[in-house]
Amino acid sequence: MLSTKSLIVLVLIAVAALVWLPRKSVEARLLIEAPPKAVWARLTDTGNYAAWNPIFVGLSGDMRPGGELALDMKLEDGQLSQITVTVDAMSEYQIIQQSAGVPGILTAHHEWSLEPAKEGTLVVQRETYRGFGVLFYDPAYVECFMRKVLKI
């Protein structure tokens, strides 16, 4: 059996590992010639994701803070995988934040940011991955698809 001192050391090591876990991020930006309201309408229309999104070809669920969405994700090899994300935050016509994964193993935090611009809307899409799984995960294909997705 572990002593109290050993247990405290293990807990501190675990907490430190979680704080300094590996991280990778991808980002894509595009100026869309439409007002933020129109872009927002497209992003929040869960029934029509397949019409414009080459990664998430199906989406169902509750698009609101605290809601869960089931996403049919097209993988790099063309196969489909379903993942569940939680909508962490939404600010109408400005931002949608979602997250998924198992803390410590691999988590993904996804953000759509809409910024009004003279010519329309600057859409910034970011995804940050954290956890030990990052050491074995290359999100380069996600960044490539993100650039395609932004052509909404």
Task: Please tell me what each predicted stretch does.
Residues 32, 36, 42, 80, ...:
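Solvent-exposed, acidic/flexible segments
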Residues 2-64:
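Hydrophobic ligand-binding cavity/cleft-lining segments
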